Each structure stands twice: as C-alpha cells, then as structure tokens.
C-alpha cells in the first residue's frame, strides 16, 4: 500500500506535480492508496487547472481504491507569500474541494469507516484543527471502533500524529499520519521532534504500528532544506489473530 500526505495543491503545486505523483505511485503497484490529509493548500483558486489535475489523479491505480481524510489546510483561507491567514468571513467550507475529490475518484472518509474486501477496516478521521475552525466535532477513536469486528485488522488515517495512545487503545493495528513535513526547513525539523512523539517514520505503540510520512509537497516557502518529500510504500501482512491476543501481526 502507498501513503501520501501534504500534497498542498495550490499556487506552488499543480498538474505537473500530480503527474509525477501518479507515475511514482503506480510504479509501486499498490493494493491500496491512502492520502492522509492536506490535499489542498487552502485557496482553491491557487490550483491553475483543477479539472486537469483531477483528471490526472484519476489515473491512480490500486486494487482497493484511493481513500483520503481531511487535513488542517483542507479549508478556505487566504494565502500571502505561502502562509495562511484567518478567514475574516469564517466561511471555511469550500464545496469545490469535495467535488475535486469526487472527480478524481478519491473517496473521502470523514470520521467514517469502510470494510474493504471483507478483510480489513479503513477509518479516516476528521482533523482537529479543521474542526475547531469550522465549529465541528470529531469522534473519539473508541467511538470509531466501537462496532467493528476486532478480529479483523483496523487501519486508521489521521492527518496529525496525535492521540497515539487513544488510537492504540481503541484497537487500531496501523495508524497512518502526516502533517509534520518532518520539519521541512531547518531548524523546524528539530522542533517537530520535540512537539510530536513520532514526528516522522515508524513507532510501535503497544500492538499498534504508527507511520508518519514527511509528505509529498510543501507548505509555506517553496523549498525543503532539512527533509525530503516522499511517497511512503508499506508492506502489510495479515495473519490470523493469536488466541487471547488482539495483535494480528
């Protein structure tokens, strides 16, 4: 499976970058593609040719489809010199973003869970920062897993790598995150390591595996000085749960 995060389609990233992503992801021949938020860079108007960009993304190929959750930049806010500012009108919801995903054949999971191939669950969480600005609420991890069959593997997509203990306690086996860009610019790469328990890479939390990707795009200045953009390719093996164990690995 492939996970990508923080593409930030907008003024700096558009159809050319989309084409490169599609080419690299399809080369991995993934069974599942997960986009862990920040598909957009706030101002939808920044995408030069959204119809063409969505058409390019429709070329993504995987056995089980392409799924996404929202990130903190997936709402309408003005941008100046690469940085976002408060929306004075507080009209954060831009329906064009949802329409873009539908046109690109990307299924949004907004505090929702799907059972894939009757073999495993995929849950996409709402982003907490986005919820605060939009006066929305998101479910706790245990609410999202309360009615799931815990003998099947449960995969979470959560843009920000917070609540790792809560997600693990709720029964998730794999937690896919992004948001941090692994700092992107020096010395932010040092600071993110102090803010987040896992700012980039792999961490095992109890029986849960947490993976945080540095992201495929950029935020703010159109550069990276301390980290690399990436598409994260993950190999997952499903094994029958051991007796009296909730760990499927």
Please place each PLM-identified region on the residue numbering.
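N-terminal low-complexity segments that are often proline-rich with Ser/Thr-Pro
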Residues: 1-3, 248
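Soluble catalytic domains of enzymes that build or remodel membrane lipids, polysaccharides, and related
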Residues: 4-244
């Amino acid at each position: 499976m492939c996970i990508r995060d923080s593409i930030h389609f907008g003024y700096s990233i558009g159809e050319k970058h989309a084409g490169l992503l599609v080419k690299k992801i399809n080369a991995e021949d993934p069974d599942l593609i997960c986009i862990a938020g920040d598909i957009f860079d706030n101002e939808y108007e920044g995408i030069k040719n959204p119809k063409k960009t969505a058409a390019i993304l429709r070329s993504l190929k995987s056995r089980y489809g392409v799924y996404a959750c929202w990130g903190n930049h997936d709402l309408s806010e003005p941008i100046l010199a690469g940085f976002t500012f408060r929306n004075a009108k507080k009209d954060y919801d831009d329906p064009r973003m949802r329409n873009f995903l539908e046109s690109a054949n990307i299924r949004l999971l907004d505090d929702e869970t799907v059972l894939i191939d009757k073999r495993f669950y995929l849950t996409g969480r709402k982003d907490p920062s986005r919820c605060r600005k939009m006066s929305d609420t998101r479910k706790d991890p245990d609410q999202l897993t309360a009615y799931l069959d815990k003998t099947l593997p449960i995969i979470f997509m959560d843009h920000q790598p917070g609540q790792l203990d809560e997600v693990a306690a709720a029964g998730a086996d794999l937690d896919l995150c992004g948001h941090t860009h692994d700092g992107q610019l020096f010395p932010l790469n040092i600071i993110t390591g102090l803010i987040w328990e896992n700012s980039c890479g792999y961490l095992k939390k109890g029986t849960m595996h947490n993976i945080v990707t540095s992201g495929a795009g950029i935020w703010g200045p159109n550069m990276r000085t301390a980290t690399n953009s990436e598409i994260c390719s993950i190999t997952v093996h499903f094994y029958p749960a051991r007796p009296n164990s909730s760990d499927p690995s």
